[in-house]
Amino acid sequence: MAQEPTSISALIDEWKTIAEFATEVGCGYEAARQMRKRESIAPRHWAAVIEASSKQGIEGVTYEWLARAWASAEVAA
């Protein structure tokens, strides 16, 4: 199992491609690319990201982890 990611981009990089991440999460390629670029995932995608991360064997991706990343991105914006 992979360790807890250090950032949203590090999380997305656990997949071979952004397209693969997008497919697993159920969003479009451009939405996934913007998530990576902005270091932020919209709350509407959190449940799917948590489930997809679990299937990938990525530890530590929880609602709390995503909320911290979301808050950090909001402060930086």
Predicted regions, residues:
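A short, Lys/Arg-rich alpha-helix, primarily the initiator
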Residues: 1-20, 24, 51-55, 59-68
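Recognition helix of helix-turn-helix/homeodomain-like DNA-binding domains
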Residues: 26-41
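Short, basic-rich loop-to-helix N-cap that marks the start of a DNA-contacting helix
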Residues: 38-51
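Helix-turn-helix/homeodomain-like alpha-helical modules used for DNA recognition
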Residues: 70-77
